[in-house]
Amino acid sequence: MSATTADCAAGHVTINMLPDDILLLIFHFDRMTHVDKLAVVNSARLRWRWHRLIHVCQRWRSIVFRSPKFLDLALICDPSTPVELIDIWPPLPIIIRDRINRHMPKDYAFQVAIAHLNRVRQIDLCFKSRSQLQRLASAMQKEFPALIHLSFDSDKFVDEFDDDSALAIPDGFLGESASCLQSLNLDFIAFPVLPKFLLSATALVRLTLQNIPDYGYFPPEAILTGLAVLVNLKYLTIGFGRPRSFPDQESCHPPPPTCAVLPALTFFKFQGASKYLDELMAGIDTPLLDSLYITFFNHFIFDISQLAQFMRRTTRIQTPNEAHVDFNYRIVKVESLSPTWTLSKKSGLSITCVAFNWELSNLVQVLMSLFPSIYIVEHLYVYGPRSFPLPWQDPMQWLEVFHPFTAVKKLYVIKEFAQHIAPALQELVGERVKDVLPTMESLFLEGLLPSGPVQEAIGQFVAARQLIGHPVAISRWKNYQVATSFDEQYCGVI
């Protein structure tokens, strides 16, 4: 199809009049628009369908295939795709992606992975049995030089239905070499020789190990050896799957004598025993770390001396301006946010304690030990369950929670806790009124009524503060789920 001079004079312009480089930019813009949409829905399993363009005409097909890198072209297939179907295409990068069927045929030989190992760029699979993982692992005993992303996970319920459920990556995987690998994600998958494997994966940017099974446990000093060479690592997650996955405290090894410096690390997430993390932190230095998320299980005495020292030398998360304390069923979560946090980049420190019968004193211990800058927090938010009762009923124990927050100016409390906190504050009379929250200027209570026992108790606290020259304004907190320290449009003064 072509446009005539008369068409141009009349303003009839077709897309075929555009030069190749302009068409290429249009294709690229279409791809980037698709990528932006995927970022919104957070789906890595969808990709730009470039093959639709090549079926429009021969010219478009030629333009697309001349710029595979610019358009980020790749062939997406599942592990059982016949090699013949791949060979009819140009030699583009290959992405192997599939949720493997439970009843995999015996000839499910992953032919693509074997025949085109030099082109496989990404593998993203979910396994439902050990035989499936073994089948793929046996096909991947050689190095995959183009592989940059590897993600293995298993059906989390596989151990309930399959006696043969020990999903583990065997020795010799990828020829024990992954020099180009940038992202490794394992979920419910054991990799016993991971520390040794990491020694060759020096290009890693993201390492995510979630729900590590018992048989995938590795001691802190072993993983430190592997981490020491990952100078490009920015995101690190180490999570043990269940409380029974954690080793006995007495069996843990002494802190490592050397330190692994991770110069690029900005995000670290851990789930496991406090002793394990304490030993790990004793051997790590992270000068750029600004986001730390920690979850402890079933420990009433936290062994965190090394972790506390680590926190003191991690200066990028030592300047929070607000803290969030969330009491939920069997969970206590304490989170501090830096003044520069955004909805897309929440930087700061988060500590979650999961236990069946945790003590309030443990929370105070964690606060004092891990939040050396808790004394400068100016905005404190207290959340909790709407239906489950708290493990303690003594209102006075709330004073223990508030005691470390000596710089708080604004306190936000949900309705369910107001009836417990108000009587505690009411007991602060005379000189004691300065012992807890001495700098508080505003108290926001969700669902506060003009009159009632809560209002009466708070009124006595306000009067006591007024007598010592430190008045407190009482306001109603309308919506605790969306209110923030920089946006108080949801708070209304009674």
Give each language-model segment a name.
Residues 1-494:
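Leucine-rich repeat
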